[in-house]
Amino acid sequence: MTAIIQVENLQKFFKVFKHHRGLGGAFRNLFSREYQLVHAVDGISFDLQPGELVGYLGPNGAGKSTTIKMLAGLLVPTGGRLSVNGQIPWQDRTKYVSKIGAVFGQRTTLWWDLPVVEGFDLLAAIYRLDPADYRRTLDRMVGLMRLERLLDQPVRQLSLGQRMRCEIAAALLHRPRILFLDEPTIGLDATTKLAVRDIVRTLNREEGVTVLLTTH
């Protein structure tokens, strides 16, 4: 079976300003800009098969989020090779994002002042989903994520756990085959973390979605 995600010797380096301390350092910073390379991701290789659910573990600063952003096409690697579902993520972005879903724990794709369901409707319009297909998928996600009582609430009024369930549903409205989850349980209490993980396992088992999830 051909891997749906192929990563070989992936690298991402960032050029960061080197700050010198003290009064002398302040003058040096003012007149001489020095930089250093930070190796955020350095030589990672792995494959994922269709339908796998894989946890990507590591401490803060290990490069987990940077890796997910490269897989999602938000960052271009410094070196190495990367293919997702036969595509290069940062090329032909419009076509690529229609095939994947992504959730970043500290960011939202929904609109803070709009009710949840209106945010879903806007995303359906952006993805140009067939109305009947969208309604079936929405009904499925609402039942799976237990969103019935949340649909008419503005996003800003939701708890963190409620918002995360809505974010995962939003990422799946266009029925992607691949889902990237970057710290989806960050800041959640233990009970809510377990609930989110159960939802992800159910999605993987019943919908066949390939999932890559980062966590500590």
Regions found by a protein language model. Name each.
Residues 22-30, 121, 125, 132-150:
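Conserved ABC ATPase "signature" region
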Residues 194-207:
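Helical segment within the ABC ATPase nucleotide-binding domain
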Residues 179-182:
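Catalytic Walker B motif of ABC-type/P-loop ATPase nucleotide-binding domains
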Residues 80-91, 95-96:
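Conserved ABC transporter NBD signature motif
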